[in-house]
Curated annotation (Swiss-Prot):
Entry function: Possesses glucomannan synthase and mannan synthase activities in vitro. Mannan synthase consists of a 4-beta-mannosyltransferase activity on mannan using GDP-mannose. The beta-1,4-mannan product is the backbone for galactomannan synthesis by galactomannan galactosyltransferase. Galactomannan is a noncellulosic polysaccharides of plant cell wall.
Organism lineage: Eukaryota, Viridiplantae, Streptophyta, Embryophyta, Tracheophyta
Protein name, per record: Glucomannan 4-beta-mannosyltransferase 1
Gene Ontology process terms (BP): cell wall organization
Broadest EC class assigned to this enzyme: transferase
Compartments reported by the entry: Golgi apparatus membrane
Organism: Oryza sativa subsp. japonica
Amino acid sequence: MEVNGGGAAGLPEAWSQVRAPVIVPLLRLAVAVCLTMSVLLFLERMYMAVVISGVKILRRRPDRRYRCDPIPDDDPELGTSAFPVVLIQIPMFNEREVYQLSIGAVCGLSWPSDRLVVQVLDDSTDPVIKEMVRIECERWAHKGVNITYQIRENRKGYKAGALKEGMKHGYVRECEYVAIFDADFQPDPDFLRRTIPFLVHNSDIALVQARWRFVNADECLMTRMQEMSLDYHFTVEQEVSSSVCAFFGFNGTAGVWRVSAVNEAGGWKDRTTVEDMDLAIRASLKGWKFVYLGDVQVKSELPSTFKAFRFQQHRWSCGPANLFRKMLMEIVRNKKVTIWKKIHVIYNFFLIRKIIAHIVTFAFYCLIIPATIFVPEVRIPKWGCVYIPTIITLLNSVGTPRSFHLLFFWILFENVMSLHRTKATLIGLLEAGRANEWVVTEKLGNALKMKSSSKSSAKKSFMRVWDRLNVTELGVAAFLFSCGWYDLAFGKDHFFIYLFFQGAAFFIVGIGYVGTIVPQS
C-alpha cells in the first residue's frame, strides 16, 4: 500500500520536475517552428491572392497571351488534314459503374474520325468487367470510331505503366498530341477544338490542362468540402502558376500533352504514385510551358465514401512528398530553367503547398495548441492561432462562393483530414512502407442511387459498428476533449470552444458518420 501510495503521490512531483526543464522548452520550440510554418503558408496564400487579383483585373486570359485560332474545317482542299492526329487514352481498373460514361463522351468528341485514335487501357482484374468494357469498345468500333481495347498481363507500374504501354504502339507515331481522361471523366464534344489550338499555334507549349467540374458535389457534406478545396486549387493555384511561370502540376486527367514533349521528358515513370506530377516537372525542366484553361471544364466524380476519399488523399499527399525527395537535386542541378523557376518549384510548389501546408495544419492546430492547455507557461500569440488561420480560411473561400456558409465545417473537416495527409507526407518523405501503395479511387456513378432505391438493399445498408470505426480519429477526439475540459476548468483563453468543436469533428469521422454509405449488394 505504501508503494502504491508513494507512486501515485510521486506522479505530480515527477511531472513538475520534468515540466520546467524539458516539457516547456520543447513545447516552446514546437510553437516557434509551427508559427514560422504558419507565416510561410500565410505569405504564400497572400501572394496568390494578390497575383490572382491582378490576373483578373488585367484580364490575363490564356487566349490573350497565346495564339489559339480555331482549326479551319471549311477548306475543301485541305479536308481533314488540317486537323492533327490526336490520341485519347482512357486508363481504367474495375470501373463497372462509370466506364460507359467516359468511353461514350470520348467517342462523341467533335473531331474528324480519321484524325482520332481512342485507347481504352483496361487493367481490370474482374473478368466480368473486362468483358463488359471490351463489348462497349466493340459497339463504338462498329459505329466507325477508331477505338482499341488493350489489356496487359500484369499491372506493373499501375496507371503510369498502362499509359506507357499504350504509347509503344506503332500507330502512336502518327499522333501529335495525346489527351488523357480517367474513367469517370466526361469531356464535352468541343473539348479538343478548344484545347488543341493552343498546342498547334504555340510550339513551346507542352500541356493544356482543363478544369474539373464535379457532377456529384451535392451528394453529401463531404463532397461539398472536397469541392471547396479543389475549386481553390483550380481557380487560384493553377491559374496563378500558369500565369506567372507557365508551370503547374498536371492533374493526371482532363489534359492534352504534346507527344514530342512527353518523349523528350522521358515518358511515363512509375517511381511514385504521382506519375502525372513527375512528368510535368521533368517536362518543365526541359523548358516546356504549360497552359491552364479555367473556362474549359470536364465533368468528373468526387469520391463520396470516406474510405475512398481517405485513400485518395493518402496518394495525393504521399506521392508529391516522395517525388520531392527523389527530384530535389535533379531540380537544383538543372541548367535549362532560371533560378526563379527552380525556387518556385522547390519552395512554392513542393515545400509550402505539398509539405508544410499538411504538417502545420495537424501539428499546430490539433496537437501543439491543445497541448499548451496543460502548460500555461507556453503562450501562443493571437495572430498565430486566430488571425492567420482565419485569413487563410477566408482566402480559400474564393474558389467556391456558393459554399461560403460552409467555411466553419470545411476548416474542421480539413483539420481532420490533415491527420491522414501529414501521415502520408511523412511516409513519402521517409519513403516508408506504403510510399508506393496505389489504391484506385472508388467511383460509384449512378450505383448509389439505384441501390438506395431498393428496399431490399436498404435493409443491408447498416454496416457493422466495427467496420465503421476509425480508431485514430477517435483517439485524437479523446485528446481534444480532454484538453477542452481542462481548459474549461482551469484555462483563461477560451480555447475550449475550438477544442470541443474540433473534437466533435474527429469523433463524427471516427464513428464513421461522414460521406455516403454504400448499401451492401
